[in-house]
């Protein structure tokens, strides 16, 4: 699901399950590599986590607010709190492990 400024904080703070937010850009090569991996994680953990993608070109203020300096950036939230930030290409297994 693509998120925009007005929704992201409400989604994060209201969620009872873990959230993974991916910050990406269409021109980002590693982001393109991660797209199918994120889809696999989403399918495997369906109903157990929420996964959102945020295009930094459409949402530059959020990229600044969340201190996104490299792409892709993955931020994991649990109980409304940021618990982990990952940058670059990630293994599916590592993401799944962190989200369980």
Q: Which ranges hold each PLM region?
A:
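Non-catalytic, surface beta->alpha helical segment in thiol-disulfide oxidoreductase systems
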Residues: 75-100
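The canonical Cys-X-X-Cys-His
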Residues: 28-31, 74
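Structural signal for short hydrophobic segments within the conserved structured cores
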Residues: 1-2, 50-52, 81-86
């Amino acid at each position: 699901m693509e998120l925009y400024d007005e929704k992201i904080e409400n989604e994060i703070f209201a969620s009872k399950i873990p959230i993974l937010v991916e910050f990406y850009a269409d021109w980002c090569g590693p982001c393109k590599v991660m797209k199918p991996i994120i889809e696999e994680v989403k399918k495997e953990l369906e109903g157990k986590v929420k996964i959102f993608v945020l295009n930094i070109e459409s949402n530059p203020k959020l990229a600044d607010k969340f201190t996104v300096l490299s792409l892709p950036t993955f931020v994991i939230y649990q109980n409304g709190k940021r618990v982990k930030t990952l940058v670059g290409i990630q293994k599916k297994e590592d993401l799944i492990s962190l989200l369980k």
